[in-house]
Amino acid sequence: MSDKIIDFSKIEKDILKFWTENKIFELCNKLSQGREEYVFFDGPPFATGLPHYGHILSGTIKDIIGRFYYQKGFHVERRFGWDCHGLPVEYEIDKKFNITDRNQILKMGIDVYNHECRKIVQKYTNEWEETVIRMGRWVDFKGSYKTMDLEFMESIWFIFKELFKRNKIYRGFKIMPFSTACKTALSNFEASQNYKNVSDPSVLVTFKIINPKDVLHNYENNDIEIFFVAWTTTPWTLPANCALVINPDYEYAIFYINNNSKKLYIMLKNRIEVYFKQFCITTVILGKELIGVSYATLFNYYENYITRGFFKTIGGNFVTITDGSGIVHTAPAFGEEDYNIFLKLGLLKPDEIPPCHIDENGKFTIAMEKYVNVPINNDISLNGVYFKDADKIILQILKPHLIYNSRIVHSYPFCWRSDTPLLYKLIPNWFVKITDIREELLTQNKKINWIPETIKYKRFQNWLSNAKDWAISRNRFWGTPLPIWARYENEIYNYTDLICVGSIKELEDLTNTKITDLHREHIDQLLIEHNGKTYKRIEDVLDCWFESGSMPYAQNHLKGIKVNNSLIDKLDNINLNNAYLIKENFPADFIGEGLDQTRGWFYTLHVISTILFNSPAFKNVIVNGIVLAEDGKKMSKRLKNYPDPMNIFNKYGADALRMYLISSPVVEAENLRFNENGVKEILKTLLIPWYNTLVFYKECQIQNHNHTLLLDAWIESELNILINKVNIDMSEYKLNNILNYALDFIENLNNWYIRINRKELKNNGLYLKTIIKRFSIVMSAFVPFFSDYSYQIVCSDKISVHLEMIPEYKSINSDFNFIKCIIDGIRHLREKYKLKLKKTLKEVIIVLDNININKNLFEKYEAVIKSECNTLDIILNDINDYSISTIIKPNFKELNKNKNVIKEKLDIISKLTVNDIENIKNGTHDININELLIETYIKDIEYSGVFITLELF
């Protein structure tokens, strides 16, 4: 039957209407009340934009797991969530109102700005619900949580205060990835989400040594100048240069180039030849002898720092011999190692900002007209120039100081939201201490079942091993305000005297003010008077990832936890209305999201649960890859390189798309190039054959008594094999083989059971009804629409397949598969010798390795074999009557699993004889039977259990 005749989309819409009118999802939840809980956490999507294939993929995975475990007898709460705060929302508003500076927001008013943010969050709700419902996903939208809701925000305050009380929160200055478009710092895991290959300058810059005798103690020639040579890919940082770092343990060389011995240069000895073909080394000197040497500044704006020890060479072990010149230009305002070494040497105080010429817009704040000792065009100015655009101007200004000027292509981080280059800059921020809990994070990770497992031991473990303190404050407006009030005197915050607020009631008591909303416009003006001192709230808001990482507790309005040493004690001592929800719903049995969340939601969940409960937040996680366009590029609305998901739903149906996605490597963290033909193939191979089964069933009479057919036990055995395989794979959270299992069964059902028994089934299809019903139940988590359509055809007296439980697996012995192999073998020979089925055979000779055992079996199915193969006679012969030869080969697929012993085993296999096979089968040999490929031949014909010879008329 052609797929053009069958409108699967209409079938699905009819089923969807049936679900809605009969409230099937609500009925499932009602019927499962009181069962054991299967806990699922739904990662909240950002409430901006429309759902794409990535959302459909992860939503399909979540829906399948939820439906399946409901059918396994659990109560599964499937509550939707919305991530409402943060950069994604603010960035949309900034674009809408052409906001480029935070002063524009302050002029607009935080209340007006946040009102616009709230509106855009609510804008996409209906579109999201339409897509989620159409894809067949069952979630509770009415009971959904929003991170902007008052109770959720209050719970975030409580969690933050718990961390604060445990000394896990601190304020500090750190080099942070900063989004100049969003005007805020990002966390390290946000910065790692969007790397791109870019071309940047690769230059060697010279710094003139003020007193050459500091380097050459016998220096007497006043005509000679000596320069340190530093390599950089960021010329825009040179105006903030404060020192040059040299490795004290390396050998450096004084040399000249271009036969100009009047200008001497110093750099790492073994790096000179990387940049210069012709050079002459005059002196070799150890790095430690070059430390403390003063040099002339390139720019004169920070000369007042000279008296503090700036603009000298300092020692640092982070200087490597593998790149650059071995001398590192150091700008502590823009480099983590730069800043840390300045703190270590006491050149900067912990609360001091070093020289910095870039503002929050990423633009230069100083004009460069007064450049020292270099004549420049008066038209050149850097004031207001974007930092990445400044490189060309800086290089033009510094042309006399450049002895090497090239380009380099390297990976550079971009803002994950605005897609603009990140600026690494020293910024005051509030942090969660991570470095002192790394080992515990790694320990808790061992308790988690990751699908695929490689994520656990590679990507996530590596990230945890190198995790840095988490920057959780954002100098923004739309978010949960940081619940910290600092002593405030003379318009200056005193960060050593803080009050952390953990609930609405606590804030009401401290301010004597009724609180109805916790957003900035409602609480920024609230002052706390305590012990004669005034406290004012820190203006920052919390990172939205802190909110999503707290959702297991905040979604149920967590507050008032009392913490003891063990998880059970902690949960037993919770003192709040919804305490039982926390205890019953933590940790989650399952979560699932994309690969990028290993540094996002998975990570923040893990950090917060480890600190609060010394426990992982989830037990099992499926990590999916990225759905790309067919050309391998990122899906882009601008490029129009992918079909609209709604068009796919309308053309092929959601079931086909669901099965296409979960049967691909994308469910094991691999990328998928979306191909519409792949969706169409699901119709061709699964849904249309299944539909044809139902068409045949409608032609059958249903008698009250069941008439047993020869293949009933076999098809029931095949169904139970399917049930068992699905149960095993789903218990291991492996989805990508489900389609193959279903295809095997539908092939056996249609092309064997029904075809062979067509006449008998038409007279009584009662047993076929049972098989279709149970198959529909097994498949209902994966293809929810068509499974219910199928179920309702064979079970008109029942409500919905989704109220049924998965059938119990029963081990049923069936001998027909052996006969099936015989029939397939005969068909193969017909095809090989181009003998059509209508050509009747005189006889078929079948050679068996145990004729006595199999003779009765052949007698049982003799009529089936003759009919299926169109032969008049079947002759059985014994293998022992033939001369046979056996070839033993290594099974490299199995041997490659342990490459340490593969050479040794290959040597053993090369010496094996036929006499060794029995011992190998019995397990009394060094070689495992699975490590071999054993081929048997009769008269050069390959033997795989039976030989078949066709005798023609």
Curated annotation (Swiss-Prot):
GO biological process: isoleucyl-tRNA aminoacylation
Keywords of this entry: Aminoacyl-tRNA synthetase, ATP-binding, Cytoplasm, Ligase, Nucleotide-binding, Protein biosynthesis
Domain of life of the native organism: Eukaryota
Primary residence: cytoplasm
The keyword Aminoacyl-tRNA synthetase appears for this protein: yes
Sequence positions that bind ATP: K637
Gene Ontology CC, one term: cytosol
Catalysed transformations (reactions): tRNA(Ile) + L-isoleucine + ATP = L-isoleucyl-tRNA(Ile) + AMP + diphosphate
The family this protein is said to belong to: Belongs to the class-I aminoacyl-tRNA synthetase family.
Protein name, per record: Probable isoleucine--tRNA ligase, cytoplasmic
